[in-house]
Amino acid sequence: MANGGGGGGGSSGGGGGGGGGSGLRMSSNIHANNLSLDASSSSSSSSSSSSSSSSSSSSSVHEPKMDALIIPVTMEVPCDSRGQRMWWAFLASSMVTFFGGLFIILLWRTLKYLWTVCCHCGGKTKEAQKINNGSSQADGTLKPVDEKEEVVAAEVGWMTSVKDWAGVMISAQTLTGRVLVVLVFALSIGALVIYFIDSSNPIESCQNFYKDFTLQIDMAFNVFFLLYFGLRFIAANDKLWFWLEVNSVVDFFTVPPVFVSVYLNRSWLGLRFLRALRLIQFSEILQFLNILKTSNSIKLVNLLSIFISTWLTAAGFIHLVENSGDPWENFQNNQALTYWECVYLLMVTMSTVGYGDVYAKTTLGRLFMVFFILGGLAMFASYVPEIIELIGNRKKYGGSYSAVSGRKHIVVCGHITLESVSNFLKDFLHKDRDDVNVEIVFLHNISPNLELEALFKRHFTQVEFYQGSVLNPHDLARVKIESADACLILANKYCADPDAEDASNIMRVISIKNYHPKIRIITQMLQYHNKAHLLNIPSWNWKEGDDAICLAELKLGFIAQSCLAQGLSTMLANLFSMRSFIKIEEDTWQKYYLEGVSNEMYTEYLSSAFVGLSFPTVCELCFVKLKLLMIAIEYKSANRESRSRKRILINPGNHLKIQEGTLGFFIASDAKEVKRAFFYCKACHDDVTDPKRIKKCGCRRLEDEQPPTLSPKKKQRNGGMRNSPNTSPKLMRHDPLLIPGNDQIDNMDSNVKKYDSTGMFHWCAPKEIEKVILTRSEAAMTVLSGHVVVCIFGDVSSALIGLRNLVMPLRASNFHYHELKHIVFVGSIEYLKREWETLHNFPKVSILPGTPLSRADLRAVNINLCDMCVILSANQNNIDDTSLQDKECILASLNIKSMQFDDSIGVLQANSQGFTPPGMDRSSPDNSPVHGMLRQPSITTGVNIPIITELAKPGKLPLVSVNQEKNSGTHILMITELVNDTNVQFLDQDDDDDPDTELYLTQPFACGTAFAVSVLDSLMSATYFNDNILTLIRTLVTGGATPELEALIAEENALRGGYSTPQTLANRDRCRVAQLALLDGPFADLGDGGCYGDLFCKALKTYNMLCFGIYRLRDAHLSTPSQCTKRYVITNPPYEFELVPTDLIFCLMQFDHNAGQSRASLSHSSHSSQSSSKKSSSVHSIPSTANRPNRPKSRESRDKQNRKEMVYR
């Protein structure tokens, strides 16, 4: 052949070794060496001269001159007589298939369009003829046309059926379609792998189809691709668009060359690299298999598949043109590059590094690189950083929680911020909780910021964070919610829309309960009325530990209790918050306050040594010997038909005998101290004086070894499982305390509804709001005294506070009717109308429309004579600047403190609010202050306006002028609600609090004049470790709200009146908080230098009163007299703590049945007849004893200065 001869001549001319007869073979071998680095791999297809060819090839590699002379157009072994390259045949098969099909489609569309146009014109002609012929000939002439239309319809139906069948076959909506799609993708990857294997061979080589295994596999794959292509073509609605799709183009340039290779017995690597474009569908395949479910994972796989497929495809094109050469250069400028070297070349090109060790030599290769570098650089710069970011984030907060054997975990979700998490962890992981073997898993859909991330790292041994949502079951499975000990949901206390926040948390509860109904959930709620929605969840069960901590209910309940005993809100808030003991050597008020702050509330089962003893006896023994303060026990009724078998009784009195397994509620500094009540043994510890030596003794070890005989108690969550006695508490109580005595039953009027249906609250018939509204002139003519003034900021668009939660504790049924403090609301009438629906069933409530910033309104309601002024705002969360959220409350507080009052107010009894402890002498009328409700003639209208005041009959106690002690607004008892803790610094201008001081360390909070909702955050962890703590707090704070009452309010949104029955009246028999003054009365001798322990024992033994704290003047420790009237709270002082005469003692007082038997009378008379109007009262002042020794003069001066201090509040 001509080309062969040319090659031979060149070979001999160059002086190459070998005879002239081997010139053709040498030329062929040199060309084969130019096409591939491994020429010997192709020599296996030659006949008997393979060994000589191999040796000739190896010798010719070292002849550099031959490369310039040889024209590499023949193959290693000629497949035909001429030895021509046939790459054009492979390429032509693909081009003919593509353009031929495209031409047919376009031709078909053109003919179809012309046919449509012609039929449209013909249809108009036939329609005109049909109209002209008339309807009489329609049946005969149209019959053949109908037959044709039926045939056409049948044909269309058959084609549609085939098309639908093909669509179902390739659709991923059916199992067959999914299997087919996955199979096509897998075979495409297999064909790509075969291409990788064949890329080590020359671009074009002779292959025997019957002997080449890879060619046979590739042929089978492509036959399947051809069938799948046919299905896709049939199912396609737009054939032209289908023909131009990427997957179709891939099939055009990969399937036909395989059939050509079988016909020609040769293989051309060609465009088989286009199979790499199938990798773009990788994310779709994984979605079909339900492997990819999240948006981030889908996006990551999409980016990776597009990047890799583009990279591999471009590398295949460079490999083809560089190993083949330029056709117009007769393929002389080729270079031998492996496929993976081309992959490397494309990567350094996309990254703009370009080392230069590998580069394109052909013109086609360089031209391709010019265009590829533009798109490749853009793709590299955008895809790679995004891929790295997705991979980094996924590794950081993705994945699943791995449970540790023997260690519980809880899931915390909801409002996850730096403030909420830090407050939660500070309380949950406090050292006073003993060993907390619980891991905390936070789940939130937003990744934490740097500060929050640093907080998680500081607690990495016990805290993990996962990004996700509790509304997604997949994320719940990731955090192992089914094996979690509990799930805690935090709320955003500062949100602008509390109802929307509650709705979000309720949806979280629904999602979690739907995934795992048995999980224990503790959630925060902002609005009280939204708690009713939790009752609609079938798996919500408060008896199994599910709890909803309503911040509005508890916040207003704490404030209401401060109206009865100022400072109680601070004391209770400190009790369920974990605080470390801070020791101060200086004799300042902070020293005594911080000693009380370190106390918390714990529960522990009582030792068997206490069995058979009364509650006061056990309480005294614990206080004196064990240095523990027990305030309540858990009572479990033996009556199985009772609606609530298990109750918590606070200071139940001496009628109760304790049995085995009684759970006690203690106030102590840490959990280890409380264990003394469980380990105490009379035989071993009776003579022990140091309470630290009371530990587990031999007697208790013998008891523990005995097999249990009763069912085990519920676990105690003080850091793990507790070994406790196995008996249920059985409390024996005399019937007269469970059901009122005969005298009280006789006095009941069964036809009058005084209490609600549960008997827990005072009730009256619903009143219209117009009947309780006072104008400013009417209020100015009304002398109000001993009342509660509620200053409320709000308007028609403000979120509701829920004032019912403030009024309910003040209307608890354990007060007698005449003991109820009148409540006067001062605020916007538009706002109060929205709240009135929940308030219209409570007695003694009035409204003065106005603003708390108006001094005229404040003077009209006699704010200087009130027992407490409460300042609330419903507009706090509508301001973006947190420092301005409390501006209204702060301005109102400062406005009241700056007011001055004159001496024109009448004379009132100094101790008009005094209580006499039950059991004292009430027979003398001189010891019973008279409470009169008088009407004074109005100057303007002449009608009788009620004067709500408390008058005392002149007796042994001196008369003082009230205005002498409250001539300044600074002496008005006040409590202000704050949203932002740091704003507490603005309430007292004379304090020295640092702006960075924690809230509980500030003077306004310690004095009980400020309250912030943030202190309630500690209830989440306290409730988790002991669910009884929340029940006790709610019992103390809400005045007796129960889950049954909440269900009733959820049904009717109001209290329902009920008749007085022995069962409902029995609910009145419960303790209430009061304040005992040491200025006068039976404890006055202990007030001057006496010990707190002696007072504790005397009050408990004599009057069944349980003392638990002191409300002391701030400067009482100073030797010099002070004009400051501020007080601070001392929680659970020790036995030897010294008392001062001005102290007020916090105590739990028993309900007195007989105190309210004599009815209060209303006298409608003039102001001059005040002294003759009387009504008996349970509010007794403690009489001065005649034989009490005279006090020193300094004491007398203090008596006169503090005569306003009441025996009880």
Swiss-Prot record:
TM segment ranges: 87-107, 179-199, 215-235, 240-260, 265-285, 301-321, 368-388
Any single Pfam family the record assigns to this protein: Ion_trans
Residues the record lists as Phosphothreonine modifications: 709, 916
Membrane topology, as annotated: Multi-pass membrane protein
Segment S7 as annotated region, ranges: 556-576
Positions contributing to Ca(2+) binding: 985, 988, 991, 993
Motif (Calcium bowl): 976-998
Regulation: Ethanol and carbon monoxide-bound heme increase channel activation. Heme inhibits channel activation.
Main location: membrane
Subcellular location: Cell membrane
Effect of residue 434 to A: Does not affect sensitivity to Ca(2+)
Alphabetized PANTHER family for the sequence: CALCIUM-ACTIVATED POTASSIUM CHANNEL ALPHA CHAIN (PTHR10027), CALCIUM-ACTIVATED POTASSIUM CHANNEL SUBUNIT ALPHA-1 (PTHR10027:SF28)
Family: Belongs to the potassium channel family. Calcium-activated (TC 1.A.1.3) subfamily. KCa1.1/KCNMA1 sub-subfamily.
Other noteworthy facts: The protein was initially thought to contain two functionally distinct parts: The core channel (from the N-terminus to the S9 segment) that mediates the channel activity, and the cytoplasmic tail (from the S9 segment to the C-terminus) that mediates the calcium sensing. The situation is however more complex, since the core channel contains binding sites for Ca(2+) and Mg(2+).
Protein name: Calcium-activated potassium channel subunit alpha-1
